[in-house]
Design a protein with these regions (language model features):
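FAD-binding core of FAD-dependent oxidoreductases
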Residues: 61-75, 79-83, 90-115, 143-165, ...
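Cysteine-centered functional microenvironments
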Residues: 142-147, 326, 330
Length: 522
């Protein structure tokens, strides 16, 4: 079950209690944040240990040494502040279009939450500043390309940190401006410098990939729920056979997602006059209809797995080295490595791609007179002079094929960096970015199917070969679409209608209607 993040208005950031919904509430819907007192105290103690280590001149990576291949180079304690600041300045090398504000806000939140763990040795002011920027709407400009996903998301996080130093660029009140100007307009005092360990503390972590991937995950969960609904409308338009959703079939297999989707289909199709009165002239349907629980259910199981991993990472400490107060140990490790996220985000993209595959096949069945159980060719009333929905299916097929390219796993790739000190990397940020691109295509493919299903229902009613009545929910969704997209009597400019339905898919308004009729819908 996924709750509505817009209901969450305020979140206490403590390092261990973020959920997917509270993350989305802050990153996308601007829920306010505050620092938990317990996290503040933990960071103060951790910072005291970092200062003690620096003062004693103990060998500690990134505090008294250089970075990467320069780990063997000793840095005098009087240069430790410059070391941290230089790390930010030298690492902001990203390229490409900037991330959307919601993704950067997610990065800021995740960095703050990780530092709240109290083992990174940074001053609390860094977290306080990040949370103040979130509350006041200062969003650093962060280009999308340049992260290998190990050592974490160094490049994007360096760009994220620049405005805190009065550098770089930021968005404020919808306008891009120099970072110093944005901070001044918001009334946030910038830092003159970072101090020892803080360069690593701000950049060593998986915050960019996790922000991109977590938002894509939330949207894919919503798309999967809506995928069941749209599939059921197509099923009704194609007069499918409901016996494929008999619970006994699914219980004997025992796959959780499959059983959930089968239950959804039974709820969604209950009370359909069209299906109650259709001719039973076949024993079973094609896979795209009969196997909706198996196809969509497998995607649901994949999303459950990805959610489990993401919610761990939302509250993870992904810095290096880490400091433990009980024995004053400073331990170098690899929590920054993105592999634990790279594989799930590849899986996320594959699951979203499969949803689109199934959707496009249902669209094809509705427009193909050989497969549609009596619908007109391409759902037009004047064949030949009108092409109807012929090219709607083309567009869906194009996006499905594009998804197959994007679905190739990023995590199987690696490339050495930093003179082979960082010799195997995760490409987790690439995996997350690909998953988002696949999701966007999938949302558009579902929009094509929904438009086609509404046209198919109208054609079915005109032919009057079965009862006229859809289920009450389907009727409500149909009417909602028809408020903006009229029946296609003759060909007309179609792209504005496609954009309108795509907007319905992305806004969440269709799921709101579903939950009015089926409150426990999952």
């Amino acid at each position: 079950m996924i709750m509505n993040p817009t209901a969450i208005k305020h979140v206490v950031v403590d390092g261990h209690s973020l959920t997917l919904e509270s993350f989305v509430a802050i990153a996308r819907y601007n829920a306010t944040v505050e620092l938990a007192p317990s996290a503040l105290e933990a960071m103060k103690k951790s910072r005291a240990l970092a200062e003690k280590i620096a003062a004693e001149g103990r060998v500690a990576y990134g505090i008294t040494t250089g970075f990467g291949e320069f780990q063997k180079v000793a840095v005098p304690k009087e240069m430790s502040n410059q070391l941290s600041t230089n790390l930010i300045l030298s690492h902001c090398t990203a390229a490409g279009e900037p991330y959307a504000d919601e993704i950067v806000r997610g990065m800021m939140l995740l960095r703050a939450n990780a530092l709240c763990g109290g083992v990174s040795g940074v001053r609390p002011i860094l977290v306080e500043m990040l949370l103040e920027m979130l509350n006041k709407g200062v969003t650093p400009v962060v280009p999308q390309k340049g992260s290998l996903g190990s050592s974490g998301d160094l490049t994007p996080l360096a760009h994220m940190t620049l405005p805190m130093l009065g550098k770089g660029e930021a968005m404020y009140e919808g306008v891009k401006m120099p970072g110093a100007e944005a901070m001044a307009k918001a009334g946030i005092k910038t830092l003159d410098t970072l101090v020892s360990k803080e360069g690593l503390g701000m950049t060593n972590g998986t915050c960019a990939m996790t922000s991109v991937g977590a938002l894509a995950l939330y949207d894919t969960i919503c798309a999967a729920q809506l995928g069941d609904v749209i599939a059921s409308m197509s099923f009704e338009g194609l007069t499918g056979l409901r016996n494929a959703f008999d619970p006994r079939i699914h219980q004997v297999r025992g796959q959780k997602g499959q059983m959930l989707v089968a239950a959804n289909m039974r709820k969604l199709l209950d009370g359909s006059e069209i299906l109650d009165n259709c001719q039973k002239d076949r024993v079973q349907d094609a896979y795209a209809l009969r196997c909706i629980p198996q196809l969509h259910g497998a995607c649901r199981d994949a999303l459950d797995y990805v959610r489990e991993k993401v919610e761990i990472e939302l509250n993870a400490v992904t810095d290096n080295p880490l400091m433990f107060l009980d024995d004053e140990a400073v331990i170098s490790g690899g929590n920054f490595h993105g592999e634990p996220m790279a594989l799930p985000f590849d899986f996320l993209g594959i699951a979203a791609s499969e949803l689109a595959d199934a959707s496009e096949r249902r669209t094809e069945r509705m427009v193909n007179p050989a497969l549609s159980n009596g619908l007109t060719a391409f759902l037009t009333t004047q064949a030949g002079v009108n092409s109807g929905f012929m090219i709607v299916q083309y567009a869906a097929a194009s996006m499905v094929s594009e998804n197959k390219i994007y679905a190739h796993p990023a995590s199987v790739d690696s490339i050495p960096s930093s003179a082979n000190q960082e010799d195997i990397v995760s490409m987790g940020t690439t995996a997350a970015r690909k998953a988002k691109m696949i999701l966007q295509n999938t949302q558009d493919v579902l929009a094509d199917e929904l438009m086609t299903a509404c046209q198919a229902i109208d054609i079915r009613r005109r032919l009057n070969t079965h009862g006229q009545g859809m289920t009450p929910l389907h009727e409500a969704l149909y009417q909602h679409v028809r408020e903006k997209v009229a029946f296609y009597e003759i060909d007309r400019e179609i792209w504005p209608d496609i954009r309108a339905v795509e907007a319905m898919i992305r806004s969440g308004e269709l799921l709101d209607i579903v939950k009015e009729y089926i409150p426990d819908f999952e």
